[in-house]
């Protein structure tokens, strides 16, 4: 089940958490927060009624770079739920070359199993660490085989007092890191992997073949000489894998996939039929993708290698810029399956100022931390932040509006010289102010032709 600390969060708390990473777009945050809370509400209902309550899927409408994808990604992290992001343009109607839409659910099941397997390994980690220590101690202190019919397992359970004292001493040294550089010889499990190239649309077959060949090679091991420091994580991972019950993991993962899975479909507008385009082959293919998506969103059974997944209660969040098409250009059946529509607003200069400074991992904080690794202390004056936001807004207005992604382009250009010279400026402090910004970017901003190609 999802993390109990986050699954009981109220919509207000979810929005506050999203505010730490994403600037503005309050309506979209409210919509996803309510959708997430409704999942918790549904799980509190009696089973008979619970099965009747369907998720209210969300359609996000807004230009590129305003936070559509980031909201969905942060929401999945927050919910600790199986999450997969796909582009609608990667899929084609059944019968055409391209990915089958059912692959979305198979990918979601894969993600869910990986998530729950890692959680199961965390739960048995302490036990796995003890087993790994025993393996290392056995390599350091081989037990003496004496007598006919010697049983090594019995000897392990009832060691002599002298052996026991020695193991206790070595275990203490091992935990203190005093033996990290000592080499030992171990039998390590071999992962038999094989690269299989498959043509477009046959990725699933390639995946099944890879799994088949890896299963054929499972159980094999090889002797390797490693330092204890390098061997310990390998042994912990191997022992944790032995302790985890794979059947329980798969059962829990499939249930979580069905009840808590989130699918984010980006660029849904690219498979909408353009109203003014007339009826042509491209439109037929696009409509076919929508019709193939429809059973997944409505609720159907999809076969995966872990078992059958029912999609009735999976939350679907679709997004698109809808520059050339309108939401009403989607087929009516699909429109009806996305009852909640949220319009995200284009970003302004004030939004850019906040994006540069407010989020937990704001862009300016990232660049300051990157250059600090070279010993350069970088700081941005407030007038520089204002000027950068103004430049990004101007360029977006004059050219294609790519939202907050414009800030990446502007900052990379601004710090180009400093990033190149950083290794030679160890110990220096650099303050970026409005004058520095104008010196580096002023000419580009004033010349529309230059800014079109460089910014």
From Swiss-Prot:
What is the protein's quaternary organization? A double ring-shaped homohexamer of HslV is capped on each side by a ring-shaped HslU homohexamer. The assembly of the HslU/HslV complex is dependent on binding of ATP.
Give one GO biological process term. Answer: proteolysis involved in protein catabolic process
- Which family does the entry's similarity section mention? Belongs to the ClpX chaperone family. HslU subfamily.
Record keywords: Cytoplasm included?
yes
The UniProt entry, under HAMAP family, shows: HslU
Per UniProt, the keywords (alphabetical) are: ATP-binding, Chaperone, Cytoplasm, Nucleotide-binding
Q: Which SMART domains match?
A: AAA (SM00382), ClpB_D2-small (SM01086)
Per the entry, what this protein does is: ATPase subunit of a proteasome-like degradation complex; this subunit has chaperone activity. The binding of ATP and its subsequent hydrolysis by HslU are essential for unfolding of protein substrates subsequently hydrolyzed by HslV. HslU recognizes the N-terminal part of its protein substrates and unfolds these before they are guided to HslV for hydrolysis.
Q: Name one GO cellular component term.
A: HslUV protease complex
- Tell me the protein's name: ATP-dependent protease ATPase subunit HslU
Its gene name is hslU
Entry's Gene Ontology molecular function annotations: ATP binding; ATP hydrolysis activity; peptidase activity; proteasome-activating activity
Signal peptide: which range, if any? none
Q: Where in the cell is it found?
A: Cytoplasm
* Pfam families cross-referenced by the UniProt entry: AAA, AAA_2
Q: What does the organism's lineage look like at the top?
A: Bacteria, Pseudomonadati, Pseudomonadota, Gammaproteobacteria, Lysobacterales
Amino acids binding ATP: 23, 65-70, 266, 333, 405
């Amino acid at each position: 089940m999802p993390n109990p600390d986050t699954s009981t969060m109220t919509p207000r708390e979810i929005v506050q958490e999203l505010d730490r990473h994403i600037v503005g777009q309050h309506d979209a945050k409210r919509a996803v927060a309510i959708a997430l809370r409704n999942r918790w509400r549904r799980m509190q209902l009696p089973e008979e009624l619970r099965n009747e309550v369907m998720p209210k899927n969300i359609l996000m409408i807004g230009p590129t770079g305003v936070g559509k994808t980031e909201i969905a990604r942060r929401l999945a992290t927050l919910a600790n739920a199986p999450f997969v992001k796909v582009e609608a343009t990667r899929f084609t109607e059944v019968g055409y070359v391209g990915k089958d839409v059912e692959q979305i659910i198979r990918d979601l099941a894969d993600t869910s199993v990986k998530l729950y397997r890692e959680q199961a390994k965390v739960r048995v980690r302490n036990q796995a660490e003890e087993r790994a220590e025993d393996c290392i101690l056995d390599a350091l202190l081989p037990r003496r085989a004496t007598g006919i019919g010697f049983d090594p397992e019995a000897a392990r359970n009832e060691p002599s007092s002298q052996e026991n004292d020695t193991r206790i001493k070595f275990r203490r040294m091992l935990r203190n890191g005093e033996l990290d550089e000592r080499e030992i010889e171990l039998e390590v499990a071999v992962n038999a992997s094989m690269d299989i190239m498959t043509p477009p649309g046959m990725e699933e077959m390639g995946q099944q073949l890879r799994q088949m060949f890896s299963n054929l090679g499972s159980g094999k091991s090889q002797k390797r000489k490693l330092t204890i420091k390098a061997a310990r994580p390998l042994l912990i991972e191997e022992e944790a894998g032995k302790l985890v019950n794979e059947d329980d993991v798969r059962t829990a993962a499939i249930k979580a996939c069905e009840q808590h899975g989130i699918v984010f479909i980006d660029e849904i507008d690219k498979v909408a039929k353009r109203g003014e385009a007339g009826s042509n082959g491209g439109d037929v293919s696009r409509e076919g993708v929508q019709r193939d998506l429809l059973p997944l969103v409505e609720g159907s059974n999809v076969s995966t290698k872990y078992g059958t997944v029912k999609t009735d209660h999976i939350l679907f969040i679709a997004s698109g810029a809808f520059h050339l098409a309108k939401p009403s250009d989607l087929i009516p059946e699909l429109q009806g399956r996305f009852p909640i529509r949220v319009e995200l607003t284009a970003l302004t200069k004030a939004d850019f100022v906040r994006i540069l400074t407010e989020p937990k991992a704001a862009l300016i904080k990232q660049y300051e931390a990157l250059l600090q690794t070279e010993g350069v202390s970088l700081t941005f004056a407030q007038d520089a932040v204002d000027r950068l936001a103004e430049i990004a807004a101007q360029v977006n207005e004059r050219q294609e509006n790519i939202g907050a992604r414009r800030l990446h382009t502007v900052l990379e250009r601004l710090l180009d010289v400093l990033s190149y010279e950083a290794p030679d400026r160890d110990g220096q402090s650099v303050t970026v102010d409005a004058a520095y910004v104008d010196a580096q970017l002023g000419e580009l901003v004033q010349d529309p032709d230059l800014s079109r190609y460089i910014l």
